[in-house]
Amino acid sequence: YNLSTMWQSPNGTIRAILDGTVFRAPILVKGIEPYVKNWEKPITLARHAYGDVYKASEMTIPGAGKCELVFTAEDGTVTKELIHEFKGPGIVQGMHNLEASITNFAHCCFKYAIDTKQDVWFSSKDTISKKYDHTFKDIFQDIYDAEYKETFEKLGITYFYTLIDDAVARVVKSKGGFIWACKNYDGDVMSDMVATAFGSLAMMTSVLVSPDGNYEYEAAHGTVQRHY
């Protein structure tokens, strides 16, 4: 296409600007049956729309050397964290997220659950990612306890956190009918799995809801022609 550079994903760029949450849900029709026979109700994927690998910086390591994370505060204070002592060529990736964006993500999920009267599951890998993923977990729990727990209990719906691998096993055994909140990459992958398991990757809605009330409707995938 004679591009001047390898531009980033247009959808990813728009999502990063709007922030918010991408809600993806299978479209159920007679004649298209779920491959997972016990699924009776739609499973809605709530995908965080900002950060992680989609806003990452990457580097090819040419040879031996030391790679560090360096944070320079406004007052000039420098904090360093060793990533790896390379003995030869390799690769490295640095990604980030924002507490404000994670907070918006949590609010979107809980409000959508109240509107639709569905349970919320949130999953990540905090046993391995003690700071990154654990921050997501803590923010979700704090917001739920402070602002939504009472309303959830009145409506008879629940929120719980579990590890991403445990969530996958639970989802397959479930009857559906809940919101599965995931980080950006997890939501990207698992939404395609859920839609396909419901019968067709092509039969999936995708709506980005931003914190300030804007909506973006998009195709939920880029390779659907391979799946007809």
List the predicted regions and their residue ranges.
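Glycine-rich phosphate/diphosphate-binding loop of Rossmann-like nucleotide-binding domains
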Residues: 71-75, 79-164
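Solvent-exposed alpha-helices and their adjacent loops that cap or buttress functional pockets
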Residues: 6, 34-39, 84, 113-114, ...
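Short acidic, glycine/serine/threonine-rich loops at helix termini
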Residues: 2, 55-60, 131-136, 171-174, ...
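Glycine-rich oxoanion-binding loops at beta->alpha junctions
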Residues: 22-24, 162-171, 225
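N-terminal glycine-rich phosphate/adenylate-binding segment common to multiple enzyme folds
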Residues: 1-78, 185-189
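Generic secondary-structure signature for well-ordered alpha-helical cores
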Residues: 16-23, 48-50, 54, 107-118, ...
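Glycine-rich phosphate/nucleotide-binding loop
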Residues: 171-228
